[in-house]
Amino acid sequence: MEAIAKYDFKATADDELSFKRGDILKVLNEECDQNWYKAELNGKGGFIPKNYIEMKPHPWFFGKIPRAKAEEMLGKQRHDGAFLIRESESAPGDFSLSVKFGNDVQQFKVLRDGAGKYLLWVVKFNSLNELVDYHRSTSVSRNQQIFLRDIEQVPQQPTYVQALFDFDPQEEGELGFRRGDFIQVLDNSDPNWWKGACHGQTGMFPRNYVTPVNRNI
């Protein structure tokens, strides 16, 4: 993945990588440390401080997602070319490209040459971002015409609960309802009080007053 340097950075240890503001860095691993990334610049590698860079968008990168999970996700997509890039299970440090085509999900190994450039076939790229952009208009396959396109986010079905008891608000911001009412859950991050909507009103309600239900309204 690509990142843009926001500030100059001068390495102070042998395993760090110096760079200048505006440099385009190739980030190899975002999981080594919460404050440091492993990256490359001009063929040299090392660690860089996370707060000195700004990552370019890469919604197609799913990290260490298993191949089976990638195939399950892409199998639900409607359009050919829906894709993701993941870290290879069989070759740590390498990447795999998973692409939907027809009823199948095809797998492509992302290769790297001696200079650290990425490729699928012949054309080489400085980063995964460049490879992805190129194959949006040039087929990733030599046998079929498959152009990369972003995954469509599947909207989540609303979650509903049903009231077990009447609840009368005691404070401002609470949601009143009657036993049997269906309540759409808007936030269930708190273990005791959830936020919901019912009869055109929104507010907080006690979790132990409701029960889960499968219902589309």
Curated annotation (Swiss-Prot):
GO cellular component: COP9 signalosome; cytoplasm; endosome; Golgi apparatus; nucleoplasm; nucleus; plasma membrane
GO biological process terms held by the UniProt record: regulation of MAPK cascade; signal transduction
Domain of life per record: Eukaryota
Gene behind this protein: GRB2
Ranges of residues in domain SH2: 60-152
Compartment(s): Nucleus; Cytoplasm; Endosome; Golgi apparatus
Matching PANTHER family: PROTEIN ENHANCER OF SEVENLESS 2B
Assembly description: Associates with activated Tyr-phosphorylated EGF receptors and PDGF receptors via its SH2 domain. Also associates to other cellular Tyr-phosphorylated proteins such as SIT1, IRS1, SHC and LNK; probably via the concerted action of both its SH2 and SH3 domains. It also seems to interact with RAS in the signaling pathway leading to DNA synthesis. Binds to and translocates the guanine nucleotide exchange factors SOS. Interacts with phosphorylated LAT2.
The protein's name in its UniProt record: Growth factor receptor-bound protein 2
InterPro entries recorded: Grb2-like (IPR043539), GRB2_C_SH3 (IPR035643), GRB2_N_SH3 (IPR035641), SH2 (IPR000980), SH2_dom_sf (IPR036860), SH3-like_dom_sf (IPR036028), SH3_domain (IPR001452)
PROSITE patterns according to UniProt: SH2 (PS50001), SH3 (PS50002)
Role, per record: Adapter protein that provides a critical link between cell surface growth factor receptors and the Ras signaling pathway.
Keyword terms: Cytoplasm, Endosome, Golgi apparatus, Nucleus, Repeat, SH2 domain, SH3 domain
GO terms, molecular function: epidermal growth factor receptor binding; phosphotyrosine residue binding
SMART domains, per database record: SH2, SH3
Domain SH3: 1-58, 156-215
Family assignment from sequence similarity: Belongs to the GRB2/sem-5/DRK family.
Native organism: Gallus gallus (Chicken)
